[in-house]
């Protein structure tokens, strides 16, 4: 696979953008190949400027659940862009989008922002304002955006690149505990009695690789928050509208006080949201005294893309059963391939998200994820990409499927994975 044009553009970009990218994981820093510079996406396929075609299992980090450039989403955006780009003023599509999100996700109220980071930052500020408390609990390996309060022992590219440039003064009120470990949570509450405003968690972690929370763990976490007058925040930036119309909450039957969204909610455009119980949400300005603002929040083009996406998901509930079938097939056949190759591994999957961990048999938290064979995963990722299967370059990210994927696409993934295993035996 040749990437001559991609290399030229990427090298030139480094003169004007730090590292040549606008988000670190895109740089393929831990691989020995140049990141393909993408020029086009259609369905489950993307194309680079060198003419290479890939089956995409990254999907803009999970955002493109309908596949790239879904016709209904594109047409809706075209209709809007002739008359509306940005106003910084109310528009009718904001109302329609808010109503659709609240009814579909079964929440009382929602506030739209421009990214997942803004959503989680707003949720924590809101929790502190509502409870009058200062501290938050987060889990090692969970990634809630790039604000300092969340980067303490975070997953995603922070872990892969071993980045530690955070303001210790800001994170002094951030308490980090172990995912799926109730003892560590109870200890945190005991040592910080009446000081914890909220617990924020990815109910299915996607940034230490895919690591699902245990059902009992989330249920007891809900009880602990109730007991101590703390809010429970589900970060569903990745899982919202991906695992179901109600996100991961439907899988666990646990209701948080606040939930954050991103990725899918914007239909591929920059968007985030925080939603939840009315009495809490009404604390946001201008109704309440917890400040949050954004000139581009509720942008009409973004709202239109998100509306078209969620509406299509709502009108086609079979999409989720099809995604479960395809992802289950991928998990089952990869398990057979790796088992036949006598590899030690585990595959964590929830719905249409999955991660392969080499060198370990079980991953339930960040410490376990870090014990996996990172070098072997890098070799695997590089081999897959060179052979036109686009996967995350980082162990601590998830792979995704879209409704545009077919059984043939899954079989091609498995075929290339089998070739990788054969190459390792030689």
Curated annotation (Swiss-Prot):
UniProt pathway annotation: Porphyrin-containing compound metabolism; protoporphyrin-IX biosynthesis; 5-aminolevulinate from L-glutamyl-tRNA(Glu): step 2/2
Quaternary state and interactors: Homodimer.
Top EC class of this enzyme: isomerase
Pfam families per UniProt: Aminotran_3
Cofactor: pyridoxal 5'-phosphate
GO biological process, one term: protoporphyrinogen IX biosynthetic process
Signal peptide start-end: none
Disulfide pairings: none
Stated name of the protein: Glutamate-1-semialdehyde 2,1-aminomutase
UniProt KW keywords: Cytoplasm, Isomerase, Porphyrin biosynthesis, Pyridoxal phosphate
Highest taxon above the source species: Bacteria
N6-(pyridoxal phosphate)lysine PTM positions: 263
Transcription recorded as keyword: no
Sample GO molecular function, one term: glutamate-1-semialdehyde 2,1-aminomutase activity
Gene name in the database record: hemL
Keyword Isomerase: yes
The EC number(s) this enzyme carries: 5.4.3.8
Matches recorded under SUPFAM superfamilies: PLP-dependent transferases
Catalytic activity: (S)-4-amino-5-oxopentanoate = 5-aminolevulinate
Family: Belongs to the class-III pyridoxal-phosphate-dependent aminotransferase family. HemL subfamily.
